């Protein structure tokens, strides 16, 4: 899927843990860098999620996408926090967690919420069934969702599952969830897609009614 990427982002640099990833953080980064003028790319180093290297001749913005207690943030509890001119959080809750758990002063950061390119107005395909969608990695509650299907006192629904670590280039991480994916494939109430390109995912979204996210 990386073959069609038309913009350079920090995560896709060689050696980065996310160098083969096209998850939500990478999609956000790609949209930012498409819109950002070269002037700002020259003046600032944008560090996304993990610190791989430091560019000494630039001001540094650290865009945080993970939980406060993720080990990658340990350097924020040391004088190394002064390496960064500004921290950017994706929600006020996340910033609060960094303040509560890591004692990061609020004035060190700004909140810029996650976003997507809006899906154009459209007509959903006519169907008698409610279309449910799960679109995330499997550890975020897919097992709970699959078990809950038998507790729903109705049959007029169909679940669409988009879930695989291959989206991040970590196909081997799917192995512990192989039985869960097989369960999805064998259930007539479910269609399992694995990981698909983002544009294909957006087309599917047009016909969905409910986001099923049980975690």
Stretch-by-stretch model annotation:
Residues 124-141, 146-149, 159-160:
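Conserved donor-binding/catalytic core segment of Leloir-type glycosyltransferases
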Residues 85-99, 104-121:
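Donor nucleotide-sugar binding/catalytic pocket of nucleotide-sugar-dependent glycosyltransferases
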Residues 44-71, 85-89, 110-112:
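Active-site proximal beta-strand in glycosyltransferases
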Residues 67-87, 179-183:
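Membrane-proximal helix-turn-helix segments that form the acceptor-binding/catalytic region
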Residues 206-215:
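Acidic donor-binding loop of glycosyltransferase active sites
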């Amino acid at each position: 899927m990386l073959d069609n990427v038309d913009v350079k982002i920090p995560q896709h640099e060689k050696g980065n843990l996310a160098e083969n990833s096209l998850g939500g953080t990478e999609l956000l980064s790609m949209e930012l860098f498409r819109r950002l003028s070269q002037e700002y790319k020259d003046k600032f180093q944008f560090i996304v999620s993990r610190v791989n290297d430091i560019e000494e001749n630039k001001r540094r913005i650290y865009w945080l996408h993970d939980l406060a207690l993720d080990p990658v943030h340990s350097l924020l509890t040391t004088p190394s926090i002064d390496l960064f001119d500004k921290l950017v959080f994706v929600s006020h809750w996340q910033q609060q967690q960094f303040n509560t758990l890591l004692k990061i002063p609020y004035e060190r950061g700004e909140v810029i919420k996650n976003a997507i390119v809006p899906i154009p107005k459209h007509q959903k395909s006519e169907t008698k069934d409610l279309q449910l969608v799960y679109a995330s990695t499997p550890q975020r509650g897919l097992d709970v969702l699959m078990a809950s299907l038998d507790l729903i006192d109705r049959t007029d629904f169909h679940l669409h599952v988009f879930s695989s670590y291959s989206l991040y280039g970590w196909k081997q991480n799917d192995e512990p969830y192989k039985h869960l994916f097989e369960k999805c494939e064998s259930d007539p109430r479910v269609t399992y897609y694995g990981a698909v390109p983002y544009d294909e995912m957006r087309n599917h979204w047009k016909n969905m009614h409910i986001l099923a996210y049980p975690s």
